[in-house]
């Protein structure tokens, strides 16, 4: 093994007030340094803040409380912080209703009255009588326990749902009689990265890992996923292991039953890209049959028709295609195209006996309807340029639902007639926002290596390109995730106050298929940062904004994007928001689900070249003394078990210790919260009020427009 730990932290700690190098004399909380060094391929790497990885330690908890106080004290001086919060609450306070779905004799839908912490699940019977079915706001006093997943059996008489406490990825599953709404079985514990899929009335399949050791729930590595079957009326300890564990070691496993209840399908993966697919014929009681093995391609089951299986895959088709095969011999050499690959990335849903292919052209949606032979039925006319999602349902459905949105259009739900192809508005939100006053345009700019990159720029009409417009530059750039236009009330308030919201579709995402994704992975990862930097330069060169009025923003992998960009080009922007970011690239794979991200990043143990490449951009390892960094708000949560808070703690500590100018470095730590999903409305509003007000304040804005 080429990597080894050189020494453990010694007992003698070096204490220093990290404000010493800050010319603004901001007195940051004291952060101790430890003498800890690791060796990678003969190279010694110091890790003075290793102790911050232990979120259970009393000294870490004390440090967190000091940083929370420091951040809140700084934010409290911003004169319009309360005004921004009021604006957000005002625009947020509108009724939000989801598309309906039918289960048994009821029609279900989610609704949030406006400012409820969590949306409520309602149901309506044939007479139109409506009642609350499940209210997540009653799961906890503070509204921080959320509904993570929900699944009904085929008849709609039984329901199992999972809950997340404090945003944790570790869930519990609760089982109800759908008619009486009473719990009928014990609560299942320690469930993670799991769906819920019923087999008749007997029970359901779910996934989990071994129970975490005491104290390691938030940071311990998760490996060897398992698919279980829980039979109603039995204890969880009696659940049948279907696949996984030591005999079939895979990091991620999901099992689900097809609509016809004939097949159990299992997807297996070791990383976030590439999977194996297995199928078991429950009717004929076969063993698992491999559809594809190895992890070179992505493949998923779209639908079945008797013995025929419909799959979508990027095998021999970087932009995806849909193929058909049979249960008797489903291996790749038997696959036949139903919907061939095109020049645009595609994903496929099924509903009402048809297939609906969503194509993405320059990050904008196009929808086509096909029959089961692959014959084009129609191209569906959308309300405009933007993002459409939905078009899924059971074979018997006559109507399907989809949503449409873009950066200046609140999400509207449409009802689609499968036979006529006509759409009608089902639910249009009554938001205090007039799209007619705003504009969203797509531009293309050139990155450092000559690659053309699309970017959406949204703002209020009448913008003057004088270089003085407050601008948020936001992106992600990883894991084949595409950033398509979507409305946000937070961005609406930003634009209402004179701001520009710009989103470049940089490499690493899925906007142009597998090749676009791969061009931003491993030793091509710097393409992502260069694309982001070029976006900022384009906005400044063309008068939209200037360095003094630009903020960089991103979350999770996007937090890495911001951290790497601000350390590579500290002169690019005035403000930076690395949110819940992956910031220690030498150790990210040591925690929770981090090892599964190696397809995108590589690891420091892979090779000397990979170690050197990661270290060359790892934000934690590239903060340099004597450098003026942007005014920074590092954003994290103390219960984040996806990207552990140690990433943000260590990066924030490095910045506070080495910042060489008056720009402040804040570490905003949300308590009793996770990676982002399931947060209460109050938590989301307050974080965004802090983010927007900090950005404007640091840009020197005195009064809101």
UniProtKB/Swiss-Prot annotation:
<dbReference type="InterPro" id="IPR002470">
    <property type="entry name" value="Peptidase_S9A"/>
</dbReference>
<dbReference type="GO" id="GO:0006508">
    <property type="term" value="P:proteolysis"/>
</dbReference>
<dbReference type="InterPro" id="IPR023302">
    <property type="entry name" value="Pept_S9A_N"/>
</dbReference>
<keyword id="KW-0378">Hydrolase</keyword>
<dbReference type="InterPro" id="IPR051167">
    <property type="entry name" value="Prolyl_oligopep/macrocyclase"/>
</dbReference>
<feature type="active site" description="Charge relay system">
    <location>
        <position position="556"/>
    </location>
</feature>
<dbReference type="GO" id="GO:0042597">
    <property type="term" value="C:periplasmic space"/>
</dbReference>
<feature type="signal peptide">
    <location>
        <begin position="1"/>
        <end position="20"/>
    </location>
</feature>
<dbReference type="InterPro" id="IPR002471">
    <property type="entry name" value="Pept_S9_AS"/>
</dbReference>
<dbReference type="InterPro" id="IPR029058">
    <property type="entry name" value="AB_hydrolase_fold"/>
</dbReference>
<keyword id="KW-0574">Periplasm</keyword>
<dbReference type="GO" id="GO:0070012">
    <property type="term" value="F:oligopeptidase activity"/>
</dbReference>
<dbReference type="GO" id="GO:0004252">
    <property type="term" value="F:serine-type endopeptidase activity"/>
</dbReference>
<comment type="subunit">
    <text>Monomer.</text>
</comment>
<dbReference type="GO" id="GO:0005829">
    <property type="term" value="C:cytosol"/>
</dbReference>
<dbReference type="Pfam" id="PF02897">
    <property type="entry name" value="Peptidase_S9_N"/>
</dbReference>
<comment type="similarity">
    <text>Belongs to the peptidase S9A family.</text>
</comment>
<dbReference type="InterPro" id="IPR001375">
    <property type="entry name" value="Peptidase_S9_cat"/>
</dbReference>
<protein>
    <recommendedName>
        <fullName>Prolyl endopeptidase</fullName>
        <ecNumber>3.4.21.26</ecNumber>
    </recommendedName>
</protein>
<keyword id="KW-0645">Protease</keyword>
<dbReference type="Pfam" id="PF00326">
    <property type="entry name" value="Peptidase_S9"/>
</dbReference>
<keyword id="KW-0732">Signal</keyword>
<feature type="active site" description="Charge relay system">
    <location>
        <position position="675"/>
    </location>
</feature>
<keyword id="KW-0720">Serine protease</keyword>
<comment type="function">
    <text>Cleaves peptide bonds on the C-terminal side of prolyl residues within peptides that are up to approximately 30 amino acids long. Has an absolute requirement for an X-Pro bond in the trans configuration immediately preceding the Pro-Y scissible bond.</text>
</comment>
């Amino acid at each position: 093994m080429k990597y080894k730990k050189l020494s453990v932290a010694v007992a003698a700690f070096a204490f220093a007030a990290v404000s010493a190098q800050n010319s603004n004399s901001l007195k940051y909380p004291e952060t101790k340094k430890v003498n800890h060094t690791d060796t990678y391929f003969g190279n010694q790497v110091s890790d003075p803040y290793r102790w911050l990885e232990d979120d259970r330690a009393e000294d870490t908890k004390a440090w967190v409380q000091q940083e929370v106080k420091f951040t809140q004290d700084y934010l409290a001086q911003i004169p319009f912080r309360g005004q921004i919060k009021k604006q957000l609450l005002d625009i947020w306070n509108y009724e939000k209703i989801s598309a309906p779905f039918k289960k048994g004799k009821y029609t279900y839908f989610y609704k949030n009255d406006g400012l409820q912490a969590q949306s409520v699940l309602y149901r309506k019977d044939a007479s139109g009588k409506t009642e609350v079915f499940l209210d997540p706001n009653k799961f906890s006093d503070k509204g921080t326990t959320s509904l993570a997943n929900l699944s009904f059996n085929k008849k709609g008489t039984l329901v199992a749902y999972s809950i997340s406490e404090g945003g944790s990825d570790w869930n519990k599953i609760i089982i109800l009689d759908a008619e009486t709404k009473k719990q009928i079985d014990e609560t299942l514990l320690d469930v993670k990265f799991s769906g819920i899929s019923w087999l008749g009335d007997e029970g359901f399949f779910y996934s989990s890992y071994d129970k975490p050791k005491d104290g390691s729930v938030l940071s311990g590595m998760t490996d060897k996923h398992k698919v279980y079957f829980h039979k109603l009326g039995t204890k969880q300890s009696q659940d049948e292991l279907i696949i996984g564990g030591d005999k079939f070691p895979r990091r991620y496993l999901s099992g689900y039953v097809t609509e016809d209840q004939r097949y159990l399908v299992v997807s297996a993966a070791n990383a976030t890209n590439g999977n194996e697919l297995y199928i078991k014929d429950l009717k004929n009681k076969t063993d698992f049959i491999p559809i594809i093995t190895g992890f070179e391609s992505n493949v998923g089951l779209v639908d079945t028709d008797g013995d025929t299986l419909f799959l979508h895959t990027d095998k021999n088709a970087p932009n995806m295609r849909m193929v058909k095969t049979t249960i008797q011999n489903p291996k790749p050499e038997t696959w036949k195209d139903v919907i061939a690959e095109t020049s645009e990335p595609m994903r496929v849903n099924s509903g009402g006996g048809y297939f609906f292919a969503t194509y993405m052209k320059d990050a904008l949606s196009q929808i086509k309807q096909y029959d089961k032979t692959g014959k084009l039925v129609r191209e569906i006319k959308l309300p405009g340029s933007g993002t459409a999602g939905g078009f899924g349902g059971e074979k018997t459905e006559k109507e399907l639902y989809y949503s449409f949105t873009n950066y200046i259009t609140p999400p509207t739900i449409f009802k689609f007639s499968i036979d006529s192809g006509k759409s009608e508005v089902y639910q249009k939100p009554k938001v205090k926002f007039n799209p007619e006053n705003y504009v969203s345009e797509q531009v293309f700019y050139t990155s450092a290596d000559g690659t053309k990159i699309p970017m959406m720029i949204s703002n209020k009409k009448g913008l003057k390109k004088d270089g003085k417009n407050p601008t948020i530059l936001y992106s992600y750039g990883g894991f084949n995730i595409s950033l398509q236009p979507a409305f946000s009330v937070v961005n609406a308030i930003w634009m209402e106050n004179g701001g520009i919201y710009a989103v470049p579709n940089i490499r690493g995402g899925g906007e142009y298929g597998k090749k676009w994704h791969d061009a931003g992975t491993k030793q091509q990862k710097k393409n992502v940062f260069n694309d982001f930097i070029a976006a900022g330069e384009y906005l400044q060169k063309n008068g939209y904004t200037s360095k003094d009025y630009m903020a960089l923003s991103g979350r999770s992998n996007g937090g890495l994007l911001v951290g790497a960009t601000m350390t590579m080009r500290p002169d690019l922007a005035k403000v930076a928001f690395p949110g819940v970011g992956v910031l220690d690239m030498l150790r990210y794979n040591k925690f929770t689900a981090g090892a599964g991200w190696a397809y995108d990043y590589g690891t420091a143990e892979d090779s000397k070249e990979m170690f050197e490449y990661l270290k060359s951009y790892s934000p934690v390892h590239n903060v340099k003394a004597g450098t003026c960094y942007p005014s920074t708000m590092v954003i994290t949560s103390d219960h984040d078990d996806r990207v552990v808070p140690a990433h943000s703690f260590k990066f924030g500590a490095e910045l506070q210790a080495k910042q060489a100018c008056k720009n402040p470095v804040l570490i905003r730590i949300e308590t009793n919260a996770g990676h982002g999903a399931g947060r209460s409305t109050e938590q989301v509003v307050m974080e965004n009020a802090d983010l927007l007000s900090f950005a404007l304040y640091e840009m020197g804005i005195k009064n809101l427009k």
